[in-house]
């Protein structure tokens, strides 16, 4: 085996293998986004004796104190069950970094530590061997965190396993609320379409509204546009919306049908108890439809014919479709836009041969007092599998300068206080 820099083509061909479980940050498109942010990029990997790539990683070189922080965002990519290969990679990476002005290196691999069911019952053993291997190479582990951290990628995820399933069989595994709300969205006639680059502001409007409502930390517009600009068809932006003209027409047709049926039944003499109950039920439905029709007509008058309900940013790579971020309108939440969007994207996975639908981030704190308990409950209702990643690892390469860097950083933080 040999450790080497890789060409873009070598890197791309390797990470296209879905069995390697690569992340959307470890794709060739991310080279352009990192360079657009002003960072140099280097692709480092391992080749076997037949010159085949068996490990790869995209590193950003972040200028710091006359040196570089080497950060592989969700790398490296390899068969991490092969501890011998991981050991070789880390050992050779250390040699490379000592020769290339590295201050310190950060790795946060897309590698599993443990898997749980939706109720946090373990399904696998803990992968302590992998964590201990990093530590044996001098890496500091950021810990088994159970909260969001702006300096780290998420460590917990909610994932749907689609392998061997159909939309119908998968839907049976959802809880009653998920099933009911998906059906509501369908009955309302909610549609989903993909936004073009020129329409991305429609996503941002919903995203900013959700940010203001929830108080969650958000990304800048430029952050999103960087991906939109460079990721091409690997970034998907669905928009769930309702066309009130179509909905009102559907309501009116349904109302007319119910009124005609009620009138026909009323015209009959000697009505049975069963018929009287049916008439009473139709009267309730007619009253409901009239209220819905009035509300929809008023909304069309004040808010327009098209109501944008929910939107999201998704990344698709060889391994999965990943829900990165989203937003929705609280004013129109009765139309169940987020449910329509997620159900549409789950079906997109089936239609395009994906075996994983990743709802992505969770804090790891599953208690009722946690900051994202509502998010967990939402994802839990889809019967997700909870995946815990191994976390962040740091290693100082230039130890003297690293000590100085940390000392200055502590001083700066004290001055801010």
UniProtKB/Swiss-Prot annotation:
Reactions that this protein is recorded to catalyse: MurNAc-L-Ala-D-isoglutaminyl-L-Lys-(N(6)-tri-Gly)-D-Ala-D-Ala-diphospho-di-trans,octa-cis-undecaprenyl-GlcNAc + 2 glycyl-tRNA(Gly) = MurNAc-L-Ala-D-isoglutaminyl-L-Lys-(N(6)-penta-Gly)-D-Ala-D-Ala-diphospho-di-trans,octa-cis-undecaprenyl-GlcNAc + 2 tRNA(Gly) + 2 H(+)
How far does the signal peptide extend, from start to end residue?
none
- Keyword set includes Endoplasmic reticulum: no
Q: Which Gene3D superfamilies does this one have?
A: 1.20.58.90, 3.40.630.30
Reported EC number(s) for this entry are 2.3.2.18
Q: Where in the cell is it found?
A: Cytoplasm
What PROSITE patterns does UniProt report for this protein, alphabetically?
A: FEMABX (PS51191)
What Pfam families does the annotation carry? FemAB (PF02388)
What GO terms describe the biological role, i.e. biological process, of this protein? cell wall organization; peptidoglycan biosynthetic process; regulation of cell shape
Task: Extract the PANTHER family matched here.
Answer: AMINOACYLTRANSFERASE FEMA (PTHR36174:SF2), LIPID II:GLYCINE GLYCYLTRANSFERASE (PTHR36174)
Family assignment from sequence similarity: Belongs to the FemABX family.
Please identify the protein, giving its name as recorded: Aminoacyltransferase FemB
Natural source organism: Staphylococcus epidermidis (strain ATCC 35984 / DSM 28319 / BCRC 17069 / CCUG 31568 / BM 3577 / RP62A)
């Amino acid at each position: 085996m040999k450790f080497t820099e890789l060409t873009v083509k070598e890197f791309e061909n390797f990470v296209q293998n879905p069995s390697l479980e690569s992340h959307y940050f470890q794709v060739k498109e991310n080279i352009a986004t990192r360079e657009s942010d002003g960072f140099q990029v280097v692709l480092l990997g391992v080749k076997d004796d037949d010159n085949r790539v068996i490990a790869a990683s995209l590193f950003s070189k972040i200028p710091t104190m006359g040196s570089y922080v080497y950060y592989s965002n969700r790398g490296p990519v390899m068969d991490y069950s092969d501890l011998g290969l991981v050991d070789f990679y880390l050992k050779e990476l250390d040699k490379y970094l000592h020769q290339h002005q590295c201050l310190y290196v950060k790795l946060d691999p897309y590698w599993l530590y443990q898997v749980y069911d939706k109720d946090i019952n373990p399904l696998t053993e803990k992968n302590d061997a992998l964590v201990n291997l990093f530590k044996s190479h001098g890496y500091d582990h950021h810990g088994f965190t159970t909260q969001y951290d702006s300096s780290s990628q998420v460590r917990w995820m909610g994932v749907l396993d689609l392998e061997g399933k159909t939309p119908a069989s998968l839907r049976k595994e959802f809880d009653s609320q998920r099933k009911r709300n998906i059906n509501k969205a369908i009955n309302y006639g909610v549609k989903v379409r993909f936004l073009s680059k020129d329409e991305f502001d429609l996503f941002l409007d919903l995203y900013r509204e959700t940010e203001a409502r929830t108080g969650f930390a958000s990304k800048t517009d430029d952050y999103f546009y960087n991906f939109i600009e460079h990721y091409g068809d690997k970034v998907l932006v669905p928009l769930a919306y309702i066309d009130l003209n179509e909905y009102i027409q559907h309501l009116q047709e349904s109302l007319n049908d119910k009124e005609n049926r009620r009138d026909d039944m009323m015209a009959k003499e000697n009505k049975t108890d069963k018929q009287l109950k049916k008439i009473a039920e139709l009267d309730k439905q007619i009253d409901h439809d009239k209220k819905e029709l009035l509300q929809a007509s008023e909304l069309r008058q004040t808010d327009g014919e098209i109501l944008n309900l929910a939107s999201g940013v998704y990344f698709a790579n060889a391994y999965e479709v990943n829900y990165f971020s989203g937003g929705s309108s609280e004013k129109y939440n009765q139309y169940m836009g987020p449910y329509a969007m997620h159900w549409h994207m789950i079906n997109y996975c089936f239609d395009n041969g994906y075996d994983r639908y990743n709802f992505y981030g969770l804090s790891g704190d599953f208690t009722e007092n946690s900051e994202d308990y509502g998010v967990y409950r939402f994802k839990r209702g889809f019967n997700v599998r909870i995946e815990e990643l191994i976390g962040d690892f740091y290693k100082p390469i230039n130890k003297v300068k690293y000590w100085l860097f940390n000392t200055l950083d502590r001083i700066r933080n004290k001055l801010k206080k």
